[in-house]
Amino acid sequence: ALRHIANQDKKVAVIFHNYPPKNSNIGSGLGLDTVESIRRLLVNMQERGYKVDFIPKDGKEFIELLTRHATNDRSMLNDRQLAEANKITGKEYGDFYHTFEQPVQEQLKKDWDEAPGHVMEYDGRLLVPGTMDGNVFITVQPPRGFGEDPSKIYHSPFCAPTHQYIAFYQWIRDIWKADAVIHVGTHGSLEWLPGKNAGLSAACYPDLTLRELPDLYIYNITITGEGIQAKRRGAAVLDEHLPAPQSQAGTYEELEELEKLMDEYVHFQRTEPDNLPRLAEMVLAKAKEANLDNEVTYDESKPFDDYLTELHNYICDLKNLEVHTGLHILGEPPLEDGLTEYLWLLTRLDNGAIPSLNQTLAGQYGYDYYYLLENSSLIYEPLNLTFNMLIDKIGSQCREVIRILQDHDFAEEGIAQVLRQPWVQEAAKQAPAQIQIGASRTGQDAATQAEPLSFLERLEMVCGYICHTIYPNLMLTTDEQKTLIRGLEGEYIWPGPSGAPSSGGADLLPTGRNFYGVD
Protein backbone atom coordinates (compact mmCIF):
# COMPACT_ATOMS: atom_id res chain seq x y z
CA ALA A 1 0.00 0.00 0.00
CA LEU A 2 2.87 2.40 0.72
CA ARG A 3 3.86 2.72 -2.92
CA HIS A 4 0.29 3.72 -3.82
CA ILE A 5 0.01 6.58 -1.29
CA ALA A 6 1.30 10.00 -2.28
CA ASN A 7 4.21 11.10 -0.08
CA GLN A 8 2.37 14.27 0.92
CA ASP A 9 -0.46 12.12 2.32
CA LYS A 10 1.63 9.52 4.16
CA LYS A 11 1.61 9.48 7.94
CA VAL A 12 4.78 8.22 9.59
CA ALA A 13 5.41 7.64 13.30
CA VAL A 14 9.06 7.95 14.37
CA ILE A 15 9.57 6.15 17.68
CA PHE A 16 12.66 6.88 19.76
CA HIS A 17 13.67 4.44 22.47
CA ASN A 18 13.55 5.87 25.98
CA TYR A 19 14.94 3.52 28.59
CA PRO A 20 15.02 4.26 31.46
CA PRO A 21 11.98 6.54 30.88
CA LYS A 22 13.61 9.88 31.65
CA ASN A 23 13.99 12.88 29.36
CA SER A 24 17.76 12.53 29.64
CA ASN A 25 17.50 9.13 27.91
CA ILE A 26 15.35 10.09 24.93
CA GLY A 27 16.91 8.64 21.80
CA SER A 28 19.08 5.95 23.38
CA GLY A 29 20.53 3.72 20.68
CA LEU A 30 23.78 1.76 20.59
CA GLY A 31 26.48 3.75 18.79
CA LEU A 32 24.00 6.02 16.98
CA ASP A 33 23.31 9.74 17.21
CA THR A 34 19.60 9.07 16.90
CA VAL A 35 18.44 12.66 17.22
CA GLU A 36 20.70 14.08 14.50
CA SER A 37 19.98 11.04 12.32
CA ILE A 38 16.23 11.70 12.44
CA ARG A 39 16.73 15.44 11.99
CA ARG A 40 18.47 14.66 8.70
CA LEU A 41 15.75 12.16 7.81
CA LEU A 42 13.18 14.95 8.19
CA VAL A 43 15.20 17.02 5.71
CA ASN A 44 15.19 14.13 3.23
CA MET A 45 11.48 13.49 3.75
CA GLN A 46 10.62 17.13 3.17
CA GLU A 47 12.63 17.10 -0.06
CA ARG A 48 10.67 14.02 -1.17
CA GLY A 49 7.34 15.77 -0.65
CA TYR A 50 6.34 14.47 2.78
CA LYS A 51 4.42 16.94 4.91
CA VAL A 52 7.04 18.12 7.40
CA ASP A 53 6.18 21.51 8.90
CA PHE A 54 9.45 22.29 10.67
CA ILE A 55 12.99 20.95 10.95
CA PRO A 56 15.07 21.65 14.08
CA LYS A 57 18.36 23.36 13.28
CA ASP A 58 20.36 20.92 15.44
CA GLY A 59 20.06 18.14 17.98
CA LYS A 60 19.76 20.50 20.94
CA GLU A 61 16.78 22.29 19.42
CA PHE A 62 15.26 18.91 18.52
CA ILE A 63 15.42 17.68 22.14
CA GLU A 64 14.04 21.00 23.41
CA LEU A 65 11.15 20.60 20.99
CA LEU A 66 10.40 17.04 22.11
CA THR A 67 10.54 17.88 25.81
CA ARG A 68 8.16 20.84 25.40
CA HIS A 69 5.52 18.19 24.77
CA ALA A 70 4.49 15.18 26.83
CA THR A 71 7.12 12.44 27.24
CA ASN A 72 7.47 9.29 29.36
CA ASP A 73 9.15 11.23 32.18
CA ARG A 74 6.31 11.54 34.68
CA SER A 75 8.40 13.73 36.97
CA MET A 76 8.64 16.39 34.23
CA LEU A 77 5.01 16.45 33.03
CA ASN A 78 3.15 19.69 33.70
CA ASP A 79 -0.53 20.61 33.41
CA ARG A 80 -0.11 22.17 29.98
CA GLN A 81 1.64 19.10 28.57
CA LEU A 82 -1.00 16.82 30.06
CA ALA A 83 -3.82 18.90 28.62
CA GLU A 84 -2.29 19.17 25.14
CA ALA A 85 -1.10 15.57 24.79
CA ASN A 86 -2.81 13.14 22.46
CA LYS A 87 -4.94 10.65 24.36
CA ILE A 88 -6.95 7.53 23.78
CA THR A 89 -10.25 7.38 25.62
CA GLY A 90 -11.16 4.62 28.00
CA LYS A 91 -13.93 3.53 25.63
CA GLU A 92 -11.62 3.44 22.59
CA TYR A 93 -9.11 1.30 24.41
CA GLY A 94 -11.82 -0.77 26.12
CA ASP A 95 -13.40 -1.69 22.80
CA PHE A 96 -9.97 -2.83 21.56
CA TYR A 97 -9.19 -4.63 24.82
CA HIS A 98 -12.35 -6.73 24.59
CA THR A 99 -11.21 -8.11 21.22
CA PHE A 100 -8.22 -9.78 22.91
CA GLU A 101 -8.24 -13.48 23.63
CA GLN A 102 -9.42 -14.28 27.15
CA PRO A 103 -5.99 -15.34 28.52
CA VAL A 104 -4.52 -12.02 27.33
CA GLN A 105 -7.27 -10.02 29.03
CA GLU A 106 -6.75 -11.96 32.24
CA GLN A 107 -2.98 -11.45 32.22
CA LEU A 108 -3.32 -7.70 31.60
CA LYS A 109 -5.84 -7.46 34.42
CA LYS A 110 -3.57 -9.43 36.76
CA ASP A 111 -0.44 -7.41 35.96
CA TRP A 112 -1.94 -3.93 35.50
CA ASP A 113 -5.51 -3.98 36.88
CA GLU A 114 -8.72 -3.41 34.96
CA ALA A 115 -8.48 -1.55 31.67
CA PRO A 116 -7.40 1.19 31.16
CA GLY A 117 -5.17 0.74 34.23
CA HIS A 118 -3.35 3.50 36.08
CA VAL A 119 -0.07 3.88 34.15
CA MET A 120 0.05 7.20 32.24
CA GLU A 121 -3.69 7.59 32.83
CA TYR A 122 -5.27 11.06 32.88
CA ASP A 123 -8.96 11.52 33.73
CA GLY A 124 -9.80 8.06 32.43
CA ARG A 125 -7.78 8.49 29.24
CA LEU A 126 -4.36 7.10 28.37
CA LEU A 127 -1.60 9.49 27.33
CA VAL A 128 0.13 9.20 23.97
CA PRO A 129 3.31 11.30 24.35
CA GLY A 130 4.91 12.89 21.33
CA THR A 131 5.28 15.85 18.99
CA MET A 132 3.35 16.30 15.75
CA ASP A 133 5.34 17.65 12.80
CA GLY A 134 3.04 17.80 9.80
CA ASN A 135 2.32 14.18 8.95
CA VAL A 136 5.23 12.94 11.06
CA PHE A 137 4.52 11.98 14.67
CA ILE A 138 7.77 11.99 16.65
CA THR A 139 7.40 10.09 19.88
CA VAL A 140 9.02 7.84 22.50
CA GLN A 141 8.30 4.16 23.05
CA PRO A 142 6.39 3.64 26.31
CA PRO A 143 8.06 1.79 29.18
CA ARG A 144 7.38 -1.93 29.44
CA GLY A 145 6.29 -1.29 32.99
CA PHE A 146 7.16 0.30 36.28
CA GLY A 147 8.37 -1.19 39.52
CA GLU A 148 11.37 -1.78 41.70
CA ASP A 149 13.30 -3.56 38.95
CA PRO A 150 12.45 -1.94 35.58
CA SER A 151 15.42 -3.63 33.86
CA LYS A 152 13.99 -7.04 34.73
CA ILE A 153 10.60 -6.04 33.32
CA TYR A 154 12.26 -4.80 30.10
CA HIS A 155 13.16 -8.33 28.94
CA SER A 156 10.65 -10.30 31.00
CA PRO A 157 9.03 -13.15 29.01
CA PHE A 158 6.12 -13.21 31.47
CA CYS A 159 5.12 -9.68 32.45
CA ALA A 160 2.55 -8.18 30.07
CA PRO A 161 3.09 -4.67 28.71
CA THR A 162 0.93 -2.01 30.33
CA HIS A 163 -2.47 -1.03 29.00
CA GLN A 164 -0.91 2.28 27.97
CA TYR A 165 1.82 0.50 25.97
CA ILE A 166 -0.79 -1.33 23.91
CA ALA A 167 -3.00 1.76 23.64
CA PHE A 168 -0.02 3.80 22.40
CA TYR A 169 0.37 1.58 19.33
CA GLN A 170 -3.42 1.36 18.94
CA TRP A 171 -3.62 5.16 18.74
CA ILE A 172 -0.81 5.33 16.17
CA ARG A 173 -2.26 2.54 14.05
CA ASP A 174 -6.07 2.84 14.31
CA ILE A 175 -6.85 6.37 15.48
CA TRP A 176 -4.13 8.55 13.97
CA LYS A 177 -3.91 5.96 11.17
CA ALA A 178 -0.16 5.88 10.52
CA ASP A 179 0.99 4.28 7.30
CA ALA A 180 4.33 3.15 8.78
CA VAL A 181 6.46 3.35 11.90
CA ILE A 182 10.21 3.81 12.23
CA HIS A 183 11.84 2.44 15.38
CA VAL A 184 15.08 4.30 15.95
CA GLY A 185 18.21 2.58 17.24
CA THR A 186 19.31 -0.61 18.98
CA HIS A 187 17.09 -1.60 20.66
CA GLY A 188 13.50 -1.22 21.82
CA SER A 189 11.17 -3.49 23.76
CA LEU A 190 8.36 -4.45 21.37
CA GLU A 191 10.16 -7.50 19.99
CA TRP A 192 10.79 -8.74 23.55
CA LEU A 193 7.15 -8.74 24.66
CA PRO A 194 5.70 -12.08 25.89
CA GLY A 195 4.54 -14.64 23.39
CA LYS A 196 5.89 -17.40 21.19
CA ASN A 197 9.44 -17.25 19.90
CA ALA A 198 8.36 -17.84 16.32
CA GLY A 199 5.09 -18.26 14.46
CA LEU A 200 3.36 -15.65 16.60
CA SER A 201 -0.40 -15.65 17.15
CA ALA A 202 -3.03 -13.14 18.26
CA ALA A 203 -2.19 -14.04 21.86
CA CYS A 204 1.44 -12.88 21.40
CA TYR A 205 1.98 -9.28 22.42
CA PRO A 206 4.25 -8.17 19.54
CA ASP A 207 1.54 -9.15 17.03
CA LEU A 208 -1.24 -7.85 19.24
CA THR A 209 0.52 -4.50 19.57
CA LEU A 210 1.89 -3.77 16.11
CA ARG A 211 -0.48 -5.85 13.98
CA GLU A 212 0.07 -5.30 10.24
CA LEU A 213 1.68 -1.84 10.50
CA PRO A 214 4.87 -1.63 8.35
CA ASP A 215 7.86 -1.42 10.70
CA LEU A 216 11.22 0.03 9.61
CA TYR A 217 13.89 -0.44 12.26
CA ILE A 218 17.25 1.37 12.34
CA TYR A 219 19.71 -1.18 13.76
CA ASN A 220 23.41 -1.54 14.54
CA ILE A 221 25.02 -3.99 12.08
CA THR A 222 27.01 -5.70 14.85
CA ILE A 223 24.02 -6.76 16.99
CA THR A 224 22.91 -9.79 15.02
CA GLY A 225 20.85 -11.80 17.51
CA GLU A 226 18.66 -8.96 18.70
CA GLY A 227 18.18 -7.74 15.14
CA ILE A 228 16.95 -11.15 14.04
CA GLN A 229 14.58 -11.06 17.03
CA ALA A 230 13.15 -7.76 15.77
CA LYS A 231 12.58 -9.32 12.35
CA ARG A 232 11.12 -12.59 13.59
CA ARG A 233 8.93 -11.24 16.41
CA GLY A 234 8.41 -7.61 15.33
CA ALA A 235 8.05 -8.16 11.58
CA ALA A 236 10.66 -5.44 11.16
CA VAL A 237 12.55 -4.49 8.04
CA LEU A 238 15.99 -3.54 9.32
CA ASP A 239 18.10 -0.61 8.16
CA GLU A 240 21.56 -1.54 9.39
CA HIS A 241 24.04 1.21 10.22
CA LEU A 242 27.78 1.44 10.85
CA PRO A 243 29.06 1.04 14.42
CA ALA A 244 30.23 4.15 16.22
CA PRO A 245 33.62 5.50 15.06
CA GLN A 246 36.63 4.15 16.92
CA SER A 247 40.30 4.90 17.35
CA GLN A 248 43.23 3.46 19.25
CA ALA A 249 43.17 4.50 22.88
CA GLY A 250 46.82 5.57 22.97
CA THR A 251 48.44 6.88 26.15
CA TYR A 252 48.20 10.13 28.07
CA GLU A 253 50.06 12.02 30.78
CA GLU A 254 51.07 9.52 33.51
CA LEU A 255 50.83 6.51 31.19
CA GLU A 256 52.91 8.24 28.56
CA GLU A 257 55.56 9.12 31.14
CA LEU A 258 55.48 5.60 32.56
CA GLU A 259 55.85 4.08 29.11
CA LYS A 260 58.90 6.26 28.48
CA LEU A 261 60.46 5.23 31.80
CA MET A 262 59.95 1.54 31.03
CA ASP A 263 61.53 1.87 27.59
CA GLU A 264 64.49 3.67 29.22
CA TYR A 265 64.81 0.84 31.75
CA VAL A 266 65.01 -1.76 28.98
CA HIS A 267 67.74 0.23 27.23
CA PHE A 268 69.67 0.87 30.47
CA GLN A 269 69.80 -2.89 31.07
CA ARG A 270 72.30 -2.99 28.22
CA THR A 271 74.00 0.39 28.47
CA GLU A 272 73.87 1.69 32.07
CA PRO A 273 73.01 -1.17 34.46
CA ASP A 274 74.18 0.86 37.49
CA ASN A 275 71.23 3.23 37.03
CA LEU A 276 68.60 0.46 37.06
CA PRO A 277 67.73 0.56 40.81
CA ARG A 278 66.93 4.28 40.67
CA LEU A 279 64.94 3.85 37.45
CA ALA A 280 63.03 0.93 38.97
CA GLU A 281 61.96 3.18 41.86
CA MET A 282 60.75 5.78 39.37
CA VAL A 283 58.75 3.15 37.45
CA LEU A 284 57.05 1.94 40.63
CA ALA A 285 56.24 5.49 41.73
CA LYS A 286 54.82 6.44 38.34
CA ALA A 287 52.77 3.22 38.18
CA LYS A 288 51.24 4.09 41.54
CA GLU A 289 50.57 7.66 40.39
CA ALA A 290 48.76 6.23 37.36
CA ASN A 291 46.69 3.97 39.66
CA LEU A 292 48.12 0.82 38.09
CA ASP A 293 49.53 -0.67 41.29
CA ASN A 294 46.33 -2.70 41.75
CA GLU A 295 46.13 -3.69 38.09
CA VAL A 296 49.69 -5.01 37.91
CA THR A 297 51.05 -5.82 41.35
CA TYR A 298 54.74 -5.84 42.21
CA ASP A 299 55.96 -8.87 44.17
CA GLU A 300 59.27 -7.98 45.83
CA SER A 301 60.17 -11.67 46.13
CA LYS A 302 60.36 -11.91 42.33
CA PRO A 303 62.75 -10.22 39.89
CA PHE A 304 61.78 -6.67 38.97
CA ASP A 305 62.20 -7.60 35.31
CA ASP A 306 59.21 -9.96 35.59
CA TYR A 307 57.07 -7.11 36.91
CA LEU A 308 58.33 -4.78 34.20
CA THR A 309 57.45 -7.27 31.45
CA GLU A 310 53.92 -7.67 32.80
CA LEU A 311 53.47 -3.91 33.18
CA HIS A 312 54.87 -3.26 29.71
CA ASN A 313 52.47 -5.76 28.15
CA TYR A 314 49.53 -4.36 30.12
CA ILE A 315 50.11 -0.80 28.90
CA CYS A 316 50.79 -1.99 25.37
CA ASP A 317 47.44 -3.80 25.36
CA LEU A 318 45.73 -0.80 26.91
CA LYS A 319 46.94 1.74 24.40
CA ASN A 320 46.14 -0.53 21.45
CA LEU A 321 42.53 -1.01 22.52
CA GLU A 322 39.87 0.43 20.23
CA VAL A 323 37.74 3.09 21.94
CA HIS A 324 34.68 4.93 20.71
CA THR A 325 35.35 8.51 19.62
CA GLY A 326 31.76 9.59 19.04
CA LEU A 327 28.46 8.42 17.60
CA HIS A 328 27.55 7.41 14.08
CA ILE A 329 25.09 9.61 12.19
CA LEU A 330 22.80 7.65 9.90
CA GLY A 331 23.90 8.01 6.30
CA GLU A 332 27.17 9.83 7.04
CA PRO A 333 30.36 8.04 5.93
CA PRO A 334 33.56 8.65 7.90
CA LEU A 335 35.57 11.56 6.49
CA GLU A 336 39.09 13.04 6.72
CA ASP A 337 40.90 11.90 9.90
CA GLY A 338 37.86 9.83 10.83
CA LEU A 339 38.18 8.01 7.51
CA THR A 340 41.87 7.31 8.17
CA GLU A 341 41.06 5.74 11.52
CA TYR A 342 38.10 3.77 10.16
CA LEU A 343 40.13 2.30 7.30
CA TRP A 344 42.87 1.32 9.72
CA LEU A 345 40.27 -0.23 12.02
CA LEU A 346 38.85 -2.28 9.13
CA THR A 347 42.29 -3.57 8.10
CA ARG A 348 43.81 -4.32 11.49
CA LEU A 349 42.79 -7.99 11.07
CA ASP A 350 42.96 -10.25 8.04
CA ASN A 351 39.89 -9.99 5.81
CA GLY A 352 39.69 -13.49 4.38
CA ALA A 353 42.67 -13.89 2.04
CA ILE A 354 43.62 -10.22 2.42
CA PRO A 355 46.35 -9.83 5.06
CA SER A 356 45.94 -7.19 7.73
CA LEU A 357 47.82 -3.94 7.28
CA ASN A 358 49.36 -4.27 10.76
CA GLN A 359 50.53 -7.81 10.05
CA THR A 360 51.88 -6.84 6.63
CA LEU A 361 54.00 -4.00 7.98
CA ALA A 362 55.17 -6.07 10.95
CA GLY A 363 56.35 -8.64 8.42
CA GLN A 364 59.02 -6.25 7.13
CA TYR A 365 60.78 -6.78 10.46
CA GLY A 366 60.33 -10.57 10.35
CA TYR A 367 57.83 -10.68 13.22
CA ASP A 368 54.21 -11.62 13.72
CA TYR A 369 52.32 -8.53 14.90
CA TYR A 370 50.71 -10.35 17.84
CA TYR A 371 54.07 -11.67 18.97
CA LEU A 372 55.23 -8.06 19.22
CA LEU A 373 52.16 -7.15 21.28
CA GLU A 374 52.66 -10.04 23.69
CA ASN A 375 56.37 -9.36 24.19
CA SER A 376 56.41 -5.58 24.18
CA SER A 377 59.38 -5.23 26.53
CA LEU A 378 61.81 -7.14 24.28
CA ILE A 379 64.31 -5.36 22.05
CA TYR A 380 64.32 -5.27 18.26
CA GLU A 381 68.07 -5.30 17.77
CA PRO A 382 68.45 -3.79 14.26
CA LEU A 383 66.75 -0.53 15.30
CA ASN A 384 67.51 -0.76 19.03
CA LEU A 385 63.79 -0.32 19.80
CA THR A 386 61.60 -2.11 22.27
CA PHE A 387 58.80 -4.06 20.64
CA ASN A 388 56.47 -1.51 22.20
CA MET A 389 58.22 1.27 20.28
CA LEU A 390 58.26 -0.88 17.15
CA ILE A 391 54.47 -1.30 17.43
CA ASP A 392 54.15 2.50 17.58
CA LYS A 393 56.33 2.77 14.48
CA ILE A 394 54.16 0.23 12.64
CA GLY A 395 51.06 2.20 13.66
CA SER A 396 52.54 5.40 12.23
CA GLN A 397 53.40 3.58 9.01
CA CYS A 398 49.83 2.22 8.76
CA ARG A 399 48.41 5.73 9.03
CA GLU A 400 50.94 7.02 6.51
CA VAL A 401 49.93 4.37 3.97
CA ILE A 402 46.24 5.17 4.34
CA ARG A 403 46.79 8.94 4.15
CA ILE A 404 48.75 8.57 0.91
CA LEU A 405 45.83 6.61 -0.54
CA GLN A 406 43.44 9.30 0.69
CA ASP A 407 45.53 12.09 -0.81
CA HIS A 408 45.24 10.37 -4.20
CA ASP A 409 41.46 9.78 -3.87
CA PHE A 410 42.06 6.03 -3.62
CA ALA A 411 43.10 5.84 -7.27
CA GLU A 412 45.78 3.51 -8.67
CA GLU A 413 48.33 6.29 -8.45
CA GLY A 414 47.91 6.26 -4.68
CA ILE A 415 48.89 2.59 -4.52
CA ALA A 416 51.89 3.25 -6.74
CA GLN A 417 52.89 6.18 -4.54
CA VAL A 418 52.79 3.99 -1.43
CA LEU A 419 55.02 1.41 -3.08
CA ARG A 420 57.49 4.14 -4.12
CA GLN A 421 58.02 5.41 -0.57
CA PRO A 422 61.71 5.15 0.38
CA TRP A 423 60.98 3.24 3.58
CA VAL A 424 58.77 0.81 1.65
CA GLN A 425 61.50 0.23 -0.94
CA GLU A 426 64.06 -0.30 1.80
CA ALA A 427 61.73 -2.69 3.63
CA ALA A 428 61.20 -4.64 0.41
CA LYS A 429 64.95 -5.26 0.22
CA GLN A 430 65.28 -6.28 3.86
CA ALA A 431 61.97 -8.07 4.58
CA PRO A 432 62.06 -11.87 4.76
CA ALA A 433 59.66 -13.79 2.53
CA GLN A 434 57.88 -15.20 5.56
CA ILE A 435 57.33 -14.18 9.15
CA GLN A 436 60.21 -15.75 11.03
CA ILE A 437 59.29 -15.18 14.67
CA GLY A 438 55.81 -15.73 16.14
CA ALA A 439 53.25 -17.91 14.37
CA SER A 440 50.34 -16.03 12.83
CA ARG A 441 47.09 -16.43 14.77
CA THR A 442 45.09 -16.41 11.59
CA GLY A 443 46.56 -19.57 10.08
CA GLN A 444 46.62 -19.67 6.30
CA ASP A 445 46.56 -15.95 5.62
CA ALA A 446 48.19 -14.34 2.62
CA ALA A 447 51.42 -13.87 4.53
CA THR A 448 51.93 -17.56 5.28
CA GLN A 449 50.82 -19.38 2.13
CA ALA A 450 52.77 -22.30 0.69
CA GLU A 451 54.08 -19.87 -1.93
CA PRO A 452 54.53 -16.74 0.17
CA LEU A 453 54.00 -13.34 -1.33
CA SER A 454 56.74 -10.77 -1.08
CA PHE A 455 56.40 -7.80 1.25
CA LEU A 456 55.56 -5.51 -1.70
CA GLU A 457 52.96 -7.95 -3.02
CA ARG A 458 51.27 -8.19 0.38
CA LEU A 459 51.26 -4.42 0.79
CA GLU A 460 49.89 -3.91 -2.71
CA MET A 461 47.17 -6.45 -1.98
CA VAL A 462 46.04 -4.60 1.16
CA CYS A 463 46.16 -1.20 -0.55
CA GLY A 464 44.17 -2.55 -3.49
CA TYR A 465 41.53 -3.94 -1.14
CA ILE A 466 41.24 -0.57 0.59
CA CYS A 467 40.94 1.37 -2.68
CA HIS A 468 38.76 -1.01 -4.69
CA THR A 469 36.51 -2.51 -2.02
CA ILE A 470 36.51 -0.97 1.45
CA TYR A 471 36.55 2.71 0.51
CA PRO A 472 33.80 2.50 -2.15
CA ASN A 473 31.61 0.49 0.22
CA LEU A 474 32.18 2.94 3.07
CA MET A 475 31.05 5.77 0.81
CA LEU A 476 27.79 3.85 0.26
CA THR A 477 27.00 4.53 3.93
CA THR A 478 24.71 7.20 2.45
CA ASP A 479 22.38 4.28 1.62
CA GLU A 480 21.39 4.18 5.30
CA GLN A 481 19.19 7.27 4.82
CA LYS A 482 18.07 6.20 1.34
CA THR A 483 16.91 2.85 2.71
CA LEU A 484 14.38 4.51 5.01
CA ILE A 485 13.00 6.56 2.13
CA ARG A 486 12.84 3.45 -0.07
CA GLY A 487 11.02 1.58 2.69
CA LEU A 488 8.52 4.39 3.23
CA GLU A 489 7.82 4.39 -0.49
CA GLY A 490 7.17 0.65 -0.61
CA GLU A 491 10.34 -0.30 -2.47
CA TYR A 492 12.42 -3.43 -1.96
CA ILE A 493 15.15 -3.21 0.70
CA TRP A 494 18.24 -5.17 -0.27
CA PRO A 495 19.40 -7.82 2.22
CA GLY A 496 22.94 -8.04 3.54
CA PRO A 497 24.97 -9.95 6.16
CA SER A 498 25.47 -8.71 9.70
CA GLY A 499 28.44 -8.81 12.06
CA ALA A 500 31.39 -6.66 13.07
CA PRO A 501 33.14 -5.11 10.05
CA SER A 502 36.19 -4.38 12.21
CA SER A 503 36.68 -8.04 13.17
CA GLY A 504 37.86 -9.21 9.77
CA GLY A 505 34.44 -8.53 8.28
CA ALA A 506 35.01 -5.59 5.96
CA ASP A 507 33.14 -7.57 3.31
CA LEU A 508 29.94 -7.02 5.36
CA LEU A 509 29.83 -3.49 3.97
CA PRO A 510 28.03 -1.54 2.67
CA THR A 511 25.43 -0.83 5.33
CA GLY A 512 21.85 0.29 4.76
CA ARG A 513 20.72 -3.29 4.18
CA ASN A 514 18.02 -5.47 5.77
CA PHE A 515 20.48 -7.68 7.58
CA TYR A 516 20.44 -11.42 8.18
CA GLY A 517 22.62 -13.58 10.41
CA VAL A 518 25.60 -15.54 9.12
CA ASP A 519 27.69 -18.24 10.76
Where would I find each of the regions flagged by the language model?
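Ligand/cofactor-recognition surfaces for anionic moieties
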Residues: 1-519
